[in-house]
From Swiss-Prot:
SUPFAM superfamilies: Radical SAM enzymes. This is Lipoyl synthase. [4Fe-4S] cluster 2 binds at C112, C116, C119. Residues 7-55 form the RPE1 insert domain. GO terms for cellular component: cytoplasm. GO terms for molecular function: 4 iron, 4 sulfur cluster binding; lipoate synthase activity; metal ion binding.
Amino acid sequence: MTNLDRHLSKFAYREEFAGNTEVLATAAYKEDCADASTGLTPKLPLEVEFGKMSKRPDWIKVKAPNSSEYYNTKDLIKNLKLNTVCEEAACPNIGECWSKKHATVMILGSVCTRACRFCNVKTGRPDLLDPHEPQRLAEAVQKLGLKHVVITSVDRDDLEDGGATHFAECISEIRKSSPNTTIEILTPDFLRKDGAAEIIANAKPDVFNHNVETVPSLYNTIRPGARYYNSLSLLHNIKKLSPEVFTKSGMMVGLGEEISEVVQVMDDLREAKVDFLTIGQYLQPTKNHAEVAKYVTPEEFKYLERVARTKGFLMVSASPLTRSSYHADEDFEKLKENYRHRHCEERRSIDVAIS
């Protein structure tokens, strides 16, 4: 049994046995998250508050979109009847990304079966699957001339495979019409969906992304329908099934977590062989969502990035406005270059050792 397997089994037992209740989940995390350098258990965050909107600092503010390319992208997406997480999740980077003809398409409908406290996507009974969506998505990719496309989705707990087959069909259609386009998918956790990881791995995306979103001690409040261990396990399984696929995960800060907890998540993700980590500021979409506990400064983000780089990630992106698919095309090129560089360094080390 690997270190990760032992770590996952502890979370699996506690979360399932406890029904993910706050007291036991917190107790479990306190045991697992003792600071390795001091032996001390970090102070756990206060209860997350709802019902109040806090003022955003200057470093969070962005310009309103007004370019012609922005509106061209908006019209194309509308005409092809596609959903985007850019709109549904009220992403602050929508103006910049759409002006560059970059959009993260959201498949499987616009209604989610989960009710995460950070997310602005609608929750409720989802619509029937649209069998023509993969073809429309492929058409949009071709018309936009995308070199790199990011596909995400709502959670579909109502589907037998959680929507994994639909993801695979989207990848297949894009490969047919845009064979040179690289494909990044940002999936749900496929909780209790046996075989979903295998379907995704066999579809061979260039990048597999699944966000852990926050630290384990906040799951019960912020991400109540999910399990931290399941997210780690999914990332690890994809890497085992398709080692050539880059894996990626992201999290938000500013929800009340301690830095030591964030560092522990970094360690867990590296144990799961994750290549690329993104860290961004949580922004409260409406007063009905979790309140921002803290606006993390740009300097603190730089610190987190430095720490993450020491853990061995191929790529780290950490800033107030960092989101999973922000600058995804540029980051993918850097990711490949970093991989080649590390591979060459390892090869040289082996050659030196042999000689």
